[in-house]
């Protein structure tokens, strides 16, 4: 599993959803965007969907449904109900590698999509947010304040990579 700041296994965590513990101070960190992508070679060989309703006819890459650990990762159903992956992994990096190798079309954070081609650009854009949680007991310490400032500065500097697409 994951390390938990509420159990003091770590002092700080970046998560996909806000933690719900009174022991934590939770703050929004940064928004980020996800979109459908495919390898250029995959599109050249198989074409690209023109509409969301075309997606079931294509090889979809996504998460192993039973291993999705956060509701924010259930985005295939947001795009089209009952859309299921033919290739699946619990790792977003493995999904990116499958897509880059021509395994199909999949949803990726835009910051992981370098070298890939966006699919359905006018129809699919998902917006999410990263959250920063710190244990209440150490939230005000100098080292955690410095770490939070540094992480927030990194996110500000990377804002265009995290959310590069117009709404």
Please annotate each region the language model reported.
Residues 130-142:
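A bilobed periplasmic-binding-protein/Venus flytrap-type ligand-binding module shared by bacterial periplasmic
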Residues 10-15:
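Short, well-ordered secondary-structure micro-motifs within conserved domains or adaptor modules
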Residues 4-7, 19-130, 157-167:
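C-terminal regulatory
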Residues 139-153, 158-159:
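Short amphipathic alpha-helical coupling segments at ligand-binding clamshell hinges
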